[in-house]
């Protein structure tokens, strides 16, 4: 029999609403994810009546969101995989930190560019912040075990926020070339 393996990336989303101004956020975002590769945190202005939208920012026809974000600040950022912190210390993310995290995303070899080809400038990132953490470190045996993903941060903005957290992970399927049967 002749088999071919297909490795692909998929993602899971979670949304959290009404994180107070200067409030802390700490949550188990996903449980049992095998081979997580990245966590993307997208903050939006909260849907509370005090802010004026009355609905989610990303649903408003008068806002360019989600194509662009708001310059919302998250401090003391930390992502934990299986009880181990990914970042050496809690992070007050700057554009340089963002580039360090994004630099290895989708990079197959050391000569690949990945996604760090300069399409996201510093001024664009500062006015449209999202927070990317590359979690693809570790040995293969650890990656193949189900892991819990924890995210914590402080909302350093003057308004309540909502966040959507994307958890990216690698998955694999096998195709029997002779019969066309696909197995996971």
Q: Which positions does each model-derived feature cover?
A:
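Flexible assembly/topogenesis modules
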Residues: 1-184
């Amino acid at each position: 029999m002749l088999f071919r393996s297909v490795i692909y990336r998929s993602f899971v989303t979670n949304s959290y609403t009404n994180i107070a101004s200067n409030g802390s956020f700490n949550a188990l975002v996903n449980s049992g994810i095998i081979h997580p590769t990245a966590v993307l945190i997208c903050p939006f202005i909260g849907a509370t009546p005090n802010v004026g939208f009355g609905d989610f920012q990303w649903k408003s026809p008068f806002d360019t969101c989600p194509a662009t974000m708001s310059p919302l600040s998250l401090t003391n950022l930390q992502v934990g995989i299986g009880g181990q912190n990914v970042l050496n210390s809690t992070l007050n993310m700057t554009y340089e930190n963002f580039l360090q995290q994004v630099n290895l995303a989708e990079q197959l070899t050391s000569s690949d560019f990945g996604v760090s080809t300069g399409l996201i400038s510093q001024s664009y990132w500062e006015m449209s912040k999202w927070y990317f953490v590359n979690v693809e470190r570790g040995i293969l045996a650890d990656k193949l075990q189900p892991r819990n993903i924890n995210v914590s941060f402080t909302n350093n903005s003057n308004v309540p926020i909502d966040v959507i957290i994307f958890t990216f992970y690698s998955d694999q399927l096998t195709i029997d070339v002779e019969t066309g049967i696909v197995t996971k």
